[in-house]
Amino acid sequence: MDAGDDLSQRAQAFARHVVRPGAPRWEAERRIAREAITAAAAIGLTGLEVPVAFGGLGLGYRVKARVAEVLGAADFGFTMSLLNTHNIAAKLAREAPAELARRHVPELLSGRRLGCTALTEAGAGSDFGAIVTMATRTAAGWRLDGAKAWITNAAEAELVVLYAQTEAGRGGCGIACFLVDAARPGFVREPAFALTGQHAIGAGGFRLEGYLARDDEMLHPPGQAFKSALRSINGARVYIASMCNGMVGEALRVASDYGLQRRSFGRPLTEHQGWRWRLAEAATELAAARLLVAQAAARIEAGADAQLYAAQAKLFATRMAERQLPVLAQAMGAEGLREHHPFGRHLAGARVAGFVDGSNEMLLERIAALQRTAPTLENP
């Protein structure tokens, strides 16, 4: 068994014993599952892609996609929260000045601190180049002013990788990337958003009011930050697609088990043709979505251009989840409404998945633009 298989097995056990039983409680309490993130950190899930030199596991993207499906099957919101902290640890380890990385990566790996990436604003979502949070040069570094919204983990994150405009009107060319410490003056946290079925995601926002960032806290200067963000978004699109596959796979498992036990008109539901055809359709679409994820994940791990493949994987998987989760919930009848089943949370998760890291409409635009130069099937 290699390290990736070992971590996948640990993730499966963690999902079974911690996330599945905990998710209904976290939703009822409307909170991020800090204690579960700490427990996940203890088995290496916050260090999946973090280099071994920093205390991480140094594994590849394909393992990350597998783990995302395993954990997403248990709860979308928790998995988003966990992966966002992991992403900040991995980014700092790879791209931050050495002293900054040495100071902060261990805190993220242990789960003592949460991380988040702050791109989105109230008036700038998929149109990333339209952000208006400003970074103004000062003698001591950079002054940050503005507001971010719809940020995963913003309700509690202590470390923020933030994107800000350095020169109004320059669009993506003027955007820089900074590390922000939420404990310092000038950072004002807004109340967490109330998202039906997805409180574990910790979505919210914050304001920057004269926050001072040092020069060494600029992770990417203008001209590089926008490109770095787009590379990260490709990875996010694929693991979100994988999480959608996990949610549908779990719903299919629950419905299949129920169909063996529940009898209707004197026989199990599985013996009714119409009922089992619904599950067959879901299983077929799930298999196709998994193949798209595998293709995109392989390209990301190889360092190849994955824009088209990531967009296709996310578009298909999110639409598949939005289409099949209601079908599988209907296959359960009223039983599917009970909160210990995942259907309510997964339906909400699928809707969130359709918006984050590029709405489905934006993905269609990207696919339309990219397919003209895409490789042929004979020359992938």
Where are these regions (language model features)?
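Glycine-rich beta->alpha junctions and the first turn(s) of the following alpha-helix
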Residues: 2, 7, 73, 189-287, ...
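Internal helix-loop-helix
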Residues: 42-112, 153-159, 300, 349
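A structural signal for short hydrophobic beta-strand segments in well-ordered beta-sheet cores
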Residues: 133-136
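Glycine-rich phosphate/pyrophosphate-binding beta-alpha loops
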Residues: 73, 85, 124, 149-154, ...
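Glycine-rich phosphate/cofactor-binding loops in nucleotide/flavin-utilizing enzymes
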Residues: 87, 332-380
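A short, Trp-centered hydrophobic/proline-enriched beta-strand micro-motif
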Residues: 111-120
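A short core secondary-structure module
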Residues: 145-189
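C-terminal helix-coil-helix/basic helical segment that borders enzyme active sites and/or dimer interfaces
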Residues: 20-28, 263-267, 283-316, 329-337
